Structure formats: C-alpha cells, structure tokens
Amino acid sequence: MSNRGNLNLNLPPSSGKYTVGENVHFELSKEKNNSTNSNPHTSSTSTSNSNNTGIGVAKSLSTNDNNNDNDNQQPQQHEQIQSKAKSQSQSQSQSQSQPQTQVQVEQQQQQQSLVNSPAAQLAAKKRKKKKSKKSSNNNGNNSNTNSNSNSEITNTSISMPHAFLNNPDEDYPTSRVIKQAPNGDVIVESLDHVGGTYEDHLHDDYSDEDTLHHHLRQAPHQASNNNHIHNHSHTSSHPLQHTPNHLHHASHNANPLTQHISASGASMRSHGHNDAHSNLWDSASLEEQEKLKEFWESLEESQKLDLVKIDKQSIMKMFKNETRQHLQQLLQNGVLNNQNASSSNNCACKYCGRRNNIIEEELENIYDNHFDDIIDFIHEVRDINDLNALPGLLFGGFHMLEEERRLQKRKQLHNEHLELAKSSNLQNQAHIEEIRAQMDKLKMNQRQQSQSQSQSQSQQQRDVQTAQSQVLSKDSSLKNANTSMNKQHTSQQLLQPQIQAQGKNNLQQNHHTHHHHQQPLQHPTVQISATFLSSNPTETQLFNKLLDPKLFEALESLDLQKMKEVSHFDPQNTAHINMLEKAGSLREIVRDLHNVDRNHLEKGMSYVQNMGKLFSNIASLNPSNPEDAEKIMTGQLNEQFNQGLSTFAEDLLKNDGSSFISMMETLSELRSAREELLKEKTPYNGLLTKTPAATSQDREQQVQPNHSHWLDEDDHDHEHEHEHEHEHEHEIDDEDHEHYCCHHHQHHHLHGDEEYDEEDEEDDEEYEYGDDEEEEDEEDEEEGEDEELEEVVEDDVDEEILDDEEEFDAKNASDTESEISEEEKMQEIRRLFLIQVIKLFQERLKSAYKEKVSKDNTRKLFEELEAEEAAKREKEAKKLKQKEKAKERKRLQQLAKEEEKRKKEEEAKRIAEELHAKQEQLKLEQKKKKEEARLRREEEKKKKLEEIKRREAEHKRKVEEQIKHDEEQRRLKEERRKELEEKKRQKEEEKKQKELLKKQKEEEKERLRIEREKQLEKEAAVSKSIPQPSPKSKHVMKLAATFQSDIPSKQNQAQNGNQSHLPPQSRLRQDEENPQKTFANSVFSAKEYNSIYQPLPGSLSNNSSSAALSVGTQLSNFQALSHPQQQQQQYSNDIYLPSANLATATVQSPRSAPINLPNGTSAVGVSLANHLSLNNSSQGSPWTTNSTLSSNLGSTGLSHGQGQTVSGVNTNLPSSIGITSGGASQIFQPQPQPQLQPHQPQQQQQQQQQQQQQQQQNYFSPFNSFSEPLVGEPFQGIVHPTTNINNSTTASSSTGAIIPPMNPSGNIWNSNIGATATNAPASVSRNNSVWSNNAITPKPSEPSFLSTAGRSSSLWGTLANAPVASSSNNNSNATANYDNNNVRSLGSSSFAPANPGQHELEVIQTAIYNCFQMMQNSNQLEFNVAPLMAIFSNVRSLTNKTQLTVNQFLNCCVSNSLYQFDFVYDDFGTVTHLKVGLNGLNDHNSVNGFSKSSTTPPLLPISAMNSKILGYTQQQQQQQQPQPQPQSQQQYPLQHSHQQRLLQLFSNNQTILSQDVTSSAFATGTNTQGSSYGQVQLGAVSPAFARTSPPGLFPNDIPLLSTINELNSTPSTGTGTGTGSGVGAGTGAVFGSGIWN
C-alpha cells in the first residue's frame, strides 16, 4: 500500500488523528528536499484515487536522517490542522476537482517517539554540551561550535506543512480517521474502532524502540569482541544511549575485516532506526508481533522456504546497503566534514569510505571459503529450517540466540561446578588450612598492610559517601540483606589485601590495569566462593532458578546505612526516610518485584542490579583484620548466607506489594530537581587523578570473586580483555561490561548525584514505556546504563586527561588485538553473518507482511467506500420504499383477505380429507379384525385336528401294546406248555438212559478189571525208572498215594475218543438219539464232595426261602464216562439222593451266605462254565444258602475200590449247602462206602441216574436271567480226543477233558449259545435276561447238559457235571513223564486239571475280589458297591479272558468259605452292582485231620495273579489272545495253553524261583497187595506262591501250591481191590479232593 521511507510526519500531541471529512492536502517546504536524493529509502508517495471518493492528501516529505540520530535536534513543533468540511467546501468551492489520492504516510518510530519526550530534550542538551566542548578543543572556539550545531538543527528541521482541500465540492465521509501506525504505515480506521490517542501510540513506540535498540546494540557488541579500531567521534543512534566515551581503541593498523566487523555493528546501531527493517521489528507492539507470527503461520510451505532462503547475493547486498546508508547518514550529519581537518585521508575505517571495496571482497571470500562453517553455526544456534520456530528467531534476533546458548552453557558449567565442588570438598578443606597458615603470616605484616589498606579504604569511603548522597529514596528493605551479603562478599576477599598491595603501584603508574594480570593471584578466592556455594547445593539450585546471580550480587552490594548518612544532599528525600526505615528486610522489594508483570519485573531487577553496582560497600569489613578473616574462614557466615538465599527465594515467590513501584514513581518526579543539583555540585573532579586506580582495583577485586562461580563461557573468554577509554566516541562494548571496570566506579564515586539522576531517569523511562519484547538481557541494560553514566561524567573531564587516556587506550588496544586468536575471529565472523542472515529474514518477512497489510488496508478502504455508496443508494431506496408502502399496504390487505379465504377453503378441504381418511381407516381396521378372527378359527381347527390325531395315535399305541402284551402272555403260556412237554420227554429219555446205564455198568465192570491189571503191570515197570525224590517230595507223595482215585476204564476213553472224532452233525444226532449217554459223558464224579464236607445235624438254615432235601440226601457225584457200563460202575457205590425231594421248585430270593473254605488262595483252572450253573436248581438261589457243613472225613469209610476219581479233577464240593424243604432241616449224612470195587450195585446206579434227571429237569431262575447253564456259553465243555498208549484202566487215558471253547464273537451281551460243541448239550434260553442271550432252546428230545435233573440243588452240585479230564501227556519233560497212560504230567497236574471249571472259578473269584479292592482303594465305588460293568471289564482284562460274558461272570460270583458276593438289583430284577468281601475262617474246624486257619490269606498282587499264577509272561499273554480258529482247533485251546504254561513254570531246574518246595505234578499209584501209594516230586515254585497257605494247615510246611495242585487233584492210579496202606489208608479217597475248591 505504501513504500517505507525515512520521513518524519509528527502529528500534534493534542490530536493523534486526522478527520477524513477535512479534505486536506499537505505540502512541505523545499528546504531539505535536495537531500532526499541521497537516501535510497526516501520516498514521496501518492496513491491512485478510488471512485472519486476518499482521501486526497498528498504529502511531499523530506527525509531527515539527522532526526534518526536525535543527538543535535530540538523537538519538532507541529501544527494541528483542524477545519470542518463545510467551511472548507464553502471557501474553496470554485477550485477544480483534483484526483482524489490516499497519502501513504511513512515514518520511523524512533523519530515519532522522541518529539515530545522530556528525556529526549535532556539528552539533546547533554550531547550538545559535550560536542561543544570537543569542538572548542579542536577549534578553540566554543561559540562557533554552538553556532554550527544550531545551524545543523536549523538546516535539518522540517518546515510547517500547509494544508488545503483538493476537492472542496466533494462530500467526504466523516466516519473514518487517518492515523499513523507504529511501523510508519497509514491506517484508515473507523471511528468506532479507534483506540487510544497519539500520546499512547507515541508512548508504546518509544518504549518499543528503546528496548529494541538495546538488543540491536548488544548484538554487534558481542560480535565486536573488543577488537574494533575507531579513531573518530561518531555519534550513537540510540535516543537514550548517549554516545559513550569509554569505548575501546585499537591501532589503525588492524586488518580491514576487523574494522568492518566493528563498523558493521556500529552501523547497525546508528542506522537501526532508519533501516527499512528496524521499525517493524524494533518498535512492533506485542499485538503486531502476534500478527506477524500469524502471518508467518498463514504462509504456505513454499513461501516460507522462499523467505528463509540464504544466498550470497542477498547477504552481500545487505552489507553494501548498510555501508552506503551509514555513509549517507554521516554525510548528512556533517561528521565527515568535521573530521576532515584532523584525519584527512589517513583513516582506514569503513566510515571514511576508502576501503569499502576491500572489505566487501574480504567478506565475499569469507562467505565463499567458510560458507559451510557459517551455515553450521547458524543451525547450531537455531535450526532455521524449522519454519515453525522462525518467528522466535526473527523477533529474538541474534541477541536471543546467544542468550539461549549462554544459558545452556551456564547451566552446564553450573552442574560441572557442583560436581567439582562435591569432589573437591576435601581439597578445599586443605586449602582452607593453607589459607589459615597464610593468615598467620599476614598477621606478621599486619601493620604494613593495614596502613596501605586504610589509605585506599578511606579514599573509597569518601567517594562512596559522595556518590551515595542521592540514593535516599532507595528501598531500605535491602539493609538487612546487605549486612549478610556484604559479609559473604567480603568473605571472598580474604586474600585481596595482598593482591591490592601488589597491584597498587601498577595502578598508580598506569591508571588502568588488565584483569588478567591479577588472575593467577585470585584462584584461592575462587575456591572459597565455590566452597560457600557448594556447601548448600539445594539452596544454591533454588537461588539459581529464581534469580539471576548478577541481581543477587547487586543486592548484596548495597549499604543503605551510608546512603542515609548522605541524605542531606537532597533535602527533598528526607520525606522518604521513614519509608526506608520501615522496610526492615528484603521482603518489600521482593514483593514488589513479584507483583509486577514480566517486563516490569525485568526492569526492576535491572534497576536494583545497577543500584548495587553504584553503591556497593567495600569497606564494611576489613579482610586484613585477623579476627574478621578468621570469623569468615571458620564458616560463621555460612548460616547467614544460606538464610539470605532462602529468604530472597521465599519472598520472591510468596509476597506481593507496591512499595517498589510507588518508589520508582516518586523518584521519577524528582529527577529535575536532582539534575540541577548535579550541575551545581562538581567539586569532585580533582579526585579523578588521585585515586582512580585504587578505586577501580578495589571494585574489580570486590566483583571478580563474586562472579567466579557464575561466569558463562563468553565471560571466561573475555573477562580479562575489557579496557575502557574515555576519548573515542564509538560504542564497541561486549557482553561482559557488567564486570564494572575502573572508570565506572571512579565516575560513580565522583558524580554520584548526576549518575543517579541519569540512572533513575533511565529506569523510570524504562518503567514508564515498558519493554514489550519477550525476553531482555540484563547484561545489556547494565552496559547501556554504564555507558550513559560514563557519557555524563565525560562532559566534566579535563582535556588533558582525555588525551592521556587516548594514548594509553591505543596502547592497550593494540595489546588486546594481538591476543585475539583466529578462532575468535572466525567466531565473530560467524556472528556477523548470523546477524546479516537474521536481518535478511526480517527484511523479507517484513516486506511480505507490509505487502499483505497494504493490500488489506486498500481492501478495507474500498470496502468502506463501497459501504458509503451503498448507504447513499439506501437513502434513495428509502424514499422509494416509503412511496411504495401505501401501495404495499393495500396490496397486503388484499392479499390478507385472499389468504384468509384460501385458508378457510383449505381448512374445509382438510376436514373433509380427514373425515374420509378416518372412514378408510375404520374400514381397514374392521377388515383386519375379520381376518384375524378367521385366522384364529383356522388355528383352533388345526389344534383340534392335531389333538384328535394325537389321541388316535395314543389309542393306537395302547392297542398295539395290549396286543403285544397278549402275544407275550400267549408266548409265555406256550413256553410253559413246551417246558412241561420237554420235562415229560426228558423223563422218558431218562428212563431209557437208565436202562442203557445198567448195561454200560455191567460192561464197564469187566473192562475196568482188565484195565486195572494192565495198569498195575505198567506202573510197576514205570516206578522202577522213576528217580528218587527228595524227602519233602516223598512225604507229599505218600500223602497223595492215600488219596488216589479210581482209574476210568479204557472202554470209556476209547468210546469218548471215537465220539470226539465224529463230525458235528453225527455227534448232534447221537446226542439227540442217546441224550443219557451224552449227559453221562459231560458230568464228572463228585464222590469226593461226600467224603469231606457233609452237613451236621441242625446246620441247615430254617429260612423259608431255601428248598430242603429229605434226610439222608447227599450230594451226588457225577463221573463222565464213555460207556454206560463205566458210568454204572462209577455210580454203583455213590450215595443216593431221593429224587422226589428234587421235584419241588420254590422261588427264592438271592441271598449271600458265608461258606467257609479254608483255602487261602485258589489255583487257576481254565474251564469253568460247563461245570457251574448257579441258578438252575429249584431249591433256591445258591448264594442264599445259610447252612454249614461239618467235615466228617474220618467216617467216610470209602473202600479201596470205591475211591475212583479222574486225574487232575477236583470233584469235591467244599462249600456247605443246606437244602430244606417245607421248613424242615435236612442233614446230609455221608454213607459209609466200602472199598472201591470193580462193580457197583445196580440200585445205586439207578438212584444216581434219577437224581441226575431231576437235576436236569428242575430249572429255576429268580429273575429269569441265570436259568441257562454255562455249558451253553463260550466256556461250554468240549471233549477232546486223546490217544491211549496202552489199554490200562486209567480214566485219564480213556476220557477227554471238557475244555470250554471261546466265544468267537467276543460279545458279552449277545453270546451265541448255538455255537457250542456237539458233546455239549444245549441250554435253556433266557427269555427275560437284560442281556438277551440268543440261546437255542433245546429240543424236547435233547437232555440239557447241565439241567437240574442230574444235579444236586446245592451250589457245588453244579460241579458234578464236570467231565473226566484227559491226562493225555504231551509233556516233553522226560523226568516227569513216566507213563503217558497212568501218570499225570506237569502240564495237567497244576493248572490243567481234569476238572478245569473249578480251577477257573477260583481264578475269576480271586480276580473279582482284587478288582473290588482296587476300585475301593481308588474311590471308584458307589456307596461301597462296585458297578457291575466296571468290575466285569476289569476282571476280564485282568484274567485275559476276552470272551468271558456277563452271564458267565455272574455265575462265577458264588459265595464260598473265602469270598462273599452280594448283588444289587434294579426294579426289573437285573443285577447292577456287586459287592465282594472275605469270609472269616473257623479255627475249630478241621478237614482231613488238618486244622483250618482263621487267618485271611494274603491277597496276591495283580501282576502275580495275572502272570505268576497263570504262568503267563507278557509275550505269552499277547500270544494267548483269542484268534479266530477252525472248529477243530478251537475245541481244546485252553487245555493246551495251560499245559504250556505249567511246563514253563514248573519244569525241572528251569523255573526254580525259590527253595520253598511246592508240589509238582507226579502222583503214581500201585495196586500191589491191595495197597495204594502216591509219589510226588517236588519242584520249584514262584515266590508269589511260596508259603501262601494258612499256617498250620499242612504238616511240614507244605506250600499252598502243592495243596492246590497236588492235594486238590485226584491221582491217576490207585484203584484196586486191596486195602489201602499209608497215610489215609482205609479211606480209599484222595487227599485233597476238592477241599480247596
């Protein structure tokens, strides 16, 4: 919108705005217009008109760069132009209309802010006085200098502008004002949004300018680094910063680069107020800065990158423009003209303009060679590519960047010092001891040192008293803190007296000294300061966070007591004494500092700091005094030091107040009076030449230790290189001016009043026009204030002193420059380029922002003008509207009527529609209800139909069930009828069989006689070849010889052998034709049962649930014979049981009864099922018998010829069974049997046959589940054919053993009974069994193999059906095989007896008991009973009998003397659970002379039972798994397997596992002279069987195995007609015939 220029349009103070309604045109006089050509920034601007309306203000302004300097100008007087639009339009109504233009007024903020400032006037006076003195020294005429100054002021002043209207006839809007922005732009604002007055803007501009120039001045100070070479009096551009006269000087021989660096910094300071970029950045308010930041953020990425692009051309252009602008400024100010006489063309600085090209070339070379280094440095300071952080870089400038780095380094150094302090505590203690030793030495020279010190102290006191006369208004709250802090300060000066004494002569000679000359002597003080600071690290850290150390230094340097003493110099300050005394502590000033905002807080802190620099008390304590030094060294001040730190930090955070602010306001009102007092009191000038060195040295010694801990990196680099001179007027200061060089303190003491006035003026102005910058460096403020004070003092300095200082300063400057390293030069170069880069960025952003602001202002102006035009058009429209209102009213009334009519019509129409809709809705609802009713009726109809169907189905089901029930009843009746027919048929067959038996017995008698003779001969021959047995073996054989059984006839064996080789059809046909013969072959002799266990009188149960036999009824003995004669011979001497008592069948409930069997364990047989039927007897359930039997073996009276048994078969009945009928107890009394004879009486045979028939016919099953015999199960006996070597009458050689075949299907639930062998008769089917056995109902002509007709009603009577076992000897053992026909081999002696059913029963019962115990131990029982299927599966897997069925398993669960089995039935009578227990043994009972032990036999381990007892190994068990075999091979698998196991277990010297002997399998007998004997060869036995018999049961500790295997089997020989000899002679029966079975 406008171009920036160096123009000065100062509006009147009373009115800071123009009223736009006054069409004003400004024209300035042409006095200074010729100078504008030299300034490239001078502009005379005019803007185009806009729509013939707006502002027609044209300004032709002359740029006056002398106003930028503000050193030689008086305040500009401005004319306030106010006239009304109407009067101007009337007075100039005939003027031509000129194009309306908008004047873009541009002005520097500095010039605007200094117009009416009293401070500016005072500064101008002081500078004029200084210049007049200098010009008088140069020219000798003060009046000429003053006239020249006045002429300069006159020449550079701006003429009063004349205003006139461009277009008086035009109607200009009066709603806007034109005013000037702080950046020089013309702002057109609405009256509603105008805020503030001109004075307010001037106030803000002044304060902003003041603050910014501190920053712009500080940056080149840092860059200069005391290396600048200036020999000319160039004025400073800072309005309040008077030209300092204590600048550093260097020789003119310095290189051009150094000169340019110095000049560049000075140029930036002097020209900073009229540079294009300075106003925007230096004087921008916070609001405008925020706008600039928002503008930056609104830019796009590409635009931001364009703004921050760094190129060589732009940077070099910045250097050149800066140089040219500075030269033009100097020309305008007449500086070069004044210096031509003295310097001519010998000056080498850039201000003379002679070496500009060389400097520019040098800069270009530096840029080319060190571009990367410079860019790295810029990035190190702040990443300029971080576009978001760039506004902070632009506003903060180089000074802020350096401050950030300084703070970081300061923190780093502080942390390092803390660590060093901690690590060096012990070393410090040692140093303190050394210092104490030095203090002792100092006592020796105390007088000499005290004299020299007293002189310097007295001089200092006088100077301090003089300088402190004007500080009575200072806050007395610093008094108490000053006491402790002065002690702390003095504690750091213990070694200074010696340093002062050494440096005094040098100071008096040279008047100045360098700090680095005394650095080696000050390190003990540094260590002491570090010790004090590190002794309390917590307080030190808090202090470092809350307050800058330099401010703390200033606070501790105050001595307000002495300020009060000199208060009489200013009588006006006496009114403030009471306020000073009331403060009492540091709280007041801390509260004031805490209560103000940030900028004012920084001002106040700087104020207090400068106060401390001026009025620090040096002589409060005497460091040379031994008492004071000892007090300090012993740490007594440490507590006060820490207390001061804590108090200051606490008050800074907590307290508040306004005393500090009110104090500063009061001081600002008294500046004028004190200024006059300063001018009058100047008698202290003479002191300058007396003690400046001493005062300076004392100040340096007092300040230097205090900063030893807080110096940053730059301070350490340059703290010893500051030398201040008083002649040169260039301002080249660096950041370390706060170290209070000697001239500062000298002038402070001499001119305290004047300095205080200047300082108060400075501070008050800073407070009044506060700084709006984000941060402010206190060091820079100190520097500026020091320079101002030095300027004031410089006016009173004699010319001779200035000359001397010039010469001395030149020497020191050359020395200083020689010490600058190349690295420092490169650092300054980097800083210089960084400054230029920042300025470049600022210029670009400023230009872009100004362009945007200009466009926005233009747009706003056009918008306002358009709004005004719219207002005019609106006025005209109003008139038209008013005219049209009447018409509109009429039209509206008409429309209202029409609308009302239309509404009525619509309402009627709407009502009709609603009525119609309601009717439609009602119809729909009625239709819906009808539909719902129809659906409900259909649904109910469906439900009724479904109910009818359901009832019909239920009725049909009931009818079917009734039909099924009727059919079942008919079937049951038919079955009963068939049963009766079958019984009848069986009776008939039995009659026929009896007749056949009679014939067979007769033939058998003859055959047996022949066989005995042959057998005796053969045995006599074999006995000769038998080796002599051991003593135990002989004893057992003797016992066994007495119990030899009769030998079956050879005829029976041959007949059975012939029958076994017949095909199944032929054998079945034979069985049907001759059932009596088949039955005779399937049973075995059970005479042994009558010889041991016979019921005693009264032992039968009186329970009504048992069926009884008549008195004298005894258990039948069945012998499976091959011929009827053999069978008749067998049964000729048996005990007869009345068959009439067997016909009665009563339903009995199952009940367990204890059956005492003295056997501790059981020998395992193979075949069980074909010899055991548990519930076929009509006399009741076998396990409910409660009767006991008493052994009456001695009264048996069996003859020698009647003890006929089958080899290896246990035919005795060990359990006691009581059979009652009608509640009467019957006693089974053993009949005296004569010796075995070849023939038996015919009557006895008939009676035995009748008993067998009755047992076969009497079927009974309480639950119709066990009515079938086990013969029909897979264990049904099969007669195996055997070969007979000789024709002896051995039963074992002539008969085949019944071996139960395995169930090939393996189905325990559905065992096919029809797959039995031919010789095994069919069994009755179980109709109501839960397992539904598919049994084949036998034909009426077929006798049941285990029917109740031929059995006893007792449990053990079922064993009478066991056939005669074959003693066919397939044994390969030569020592045991004596005679294949007469002697039992090992294979059939123990585990393959002729009666395998009993043997198998014991195995299964033992396994059942062990499984029950296992389940009980593992908590698998259910209410102390085991589930049937669980224990059944365990027993089957344990015994390796995979084809064992549930029916067979239940038949084996028979209670005996050893085990007791209890069943649990369900509602249908099916067994669901089983309980197994042990029965107790009676000690008073004895069997065959052996007492039965009551000790429960130990249970064998399962592994022993499974492998040891059965003789299995795991490999053999796997081999013994049932395999599908042909029928011819399945007939005798178990017998063969038993023989193999016995061969492996009991073969000679092959399976000897223990020395405990057990009976082997050898039993022989002879019939010599009517005597029988038995020989038993003992063999080794498994440890599992060793000594397992009950104690005392057998003599000579015969093991249980021999009892089971030997004594329990019937010898194969021993039948004859003679009288038996040996043990058991006269009994004619065997020793162990079934006592364990």
UniProtKB/Swiss-Prot annotation:
Coiled coil: 855-1023
Main location: cytoplasm
Record's compositionally biased regions (Low complexity): 34-53, 64-113, 135-155, 446-470, 1176-1199, 1234-1257, 1282-1299, 1514-1534
Start-end of Polar residues biased regions: 1-17, 471-487, 692-706, 1049-1063, 1201-1228, 1258-1267
Bias (Basic residues): 124-134
Region of interest: Disordered: 1-155, 221-252, 442-494, 504-523, 681-734, 746-825, 871-1036, 1049-1075, 1176-1299, 1512-1534
Basic and acidic residues: compositionally biased ranges: 24-33, 717-734, 871-887, 896-1021
One Pfam family hit: NST1
Keywords: Coiled coil, Cytoplasm, Stress response
GO CC terms: cytoplasm
Acidic residues: bias regions: 754-808
Cellular localization per UniProt: Cytoplasm
Domain of life: Eukaryota
Family, per entry: Belongs to the NST1 family.
Entry function: May act as a negative regulator of salt tolerance.
Protein name per its UniProtKB record: Stress response protein NST1
Origin species: Lodderomyces elongisporus (strain ATCC 11503 / CBS 2605 / JCM 1781 / NBRC 1676 / NRRL YB-4239)
